[in-house]
């Protein structure tokens, strides 16, 4: 039932993706849903049709606190993290219509192989390859497997690596090794996602997985790279619908701690 509700709400929502050039606050252009029709949902849960229209379409996705491009990134990340490939198909299409590039979609999947697991990433690949094929997106349009990496913030990396080594080096040397290379010295330095967006993906996936203990570090990193306090709060509001209210409330407590520490709350 839980999976059905998620799919139903998603299909209603996806009756209204938008074009990239639309301004925030404009009503979405309706499209026919491709997973569940409104009639299918009416036959089982009529209230979901109302909530899907009044709340998801006409309210949540219209809110100006977060760009639709960013909402699309958050949603795609959550669906990959929760391994929901049926819903992901529609939201990858919506993301591409909302100015998320094929390179960015590719990098989101690659990034989440590390944060949500290889099987989840492979499930996302299986869905996305058909979308790319239908849109004529070719391999040569995607980022290189081994691109020139972004410049490393050596001071921040030194602090991260020393903390990890001190806390976990004697327990799991392998984890410490792989956290440095490839995670932070390769994956995080890939240019296919801007640092702010890579952190946005990570925070969204952590919320979806209920991993609130890890959110603070990555939210601080996102805000160091340009994410605003308003956007941070809105990510949690958006995630409530796609990852569930309990996960959102677990996350909002951590977000509040980060904002207070930065003098940004209120």
Give the residues covered by each predicted segment.
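Helix N-cap / loop-to-helix initiation motif
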Residues: 67, 101-106, 194, 228-230
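Preference for long, well-ordered alpha-helical segments
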Residues: 120-121, 211, 231-250
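Short, structured motif recognition centered on aromatic/hydrophobic residues
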Residues: 71-79, 108-109, 198-206, 235-239
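Sec-dependent signal peptide recognition
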Residues: 1-7
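Bacterial N-terminal signal peptides
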Residues: 7-15
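A short structural micro-motif
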Residues: 80, 98, 111-118, 207, ...
């Amino acid at each position: 039932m839980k999976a059905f509700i998620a799919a139903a709400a998603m299909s209603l929502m996806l009756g209204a993706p938008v074009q990239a050039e639309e301004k925030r606050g404009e009503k979405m252009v309706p499209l026919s849903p491709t997973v569940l029709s409104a009639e299918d949902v009416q036959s089982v849960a009529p209230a979901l049709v109302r909530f899907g229209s009044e709340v998801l379409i006409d309210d949540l996705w219209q809110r100006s606190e977060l760009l639709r491009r960013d909402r699309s990134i958050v949603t795609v990340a959550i669906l990959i993290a929760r391994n929901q490939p049926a819903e992901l198909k529609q939201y990858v299409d919506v993301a591409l219509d909302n100015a998320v590039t094929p390179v960015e979609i590719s990098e989101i999947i690659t990034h989440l192989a590390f944060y949500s697991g290889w099987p989840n990433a492979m499930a996302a690949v299986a869905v996305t390859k058909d979308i790319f094929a239908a849109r004529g997106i070719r391999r040569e349009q995607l980022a290189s497997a081994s691109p020139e990496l972004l410049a490393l913030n050596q001071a921040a990396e030194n602090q991260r690596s020393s903390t990890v080594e001190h806390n976990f080096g004697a327990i799991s040397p392998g984890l410490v090794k792989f956290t440095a290379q490839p995670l932070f010295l390769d994956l995080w330095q890939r240019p296919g996602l801007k640092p702010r967006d890579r952190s946005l993906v990570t925070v969204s996936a952590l919320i979806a997985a209920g991993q609130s203990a890890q959110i603070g570090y990555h939210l601080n990193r996102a805000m160091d790279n340009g994410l605003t306090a308003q956007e941070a709060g809105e990510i949690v509001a958006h995630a409530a619908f796609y990852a569930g209210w309990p996960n959102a409330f677990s996350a909002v407590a951590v977000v509040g701690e980060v904002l207070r520490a930065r003098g940004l709350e209120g």
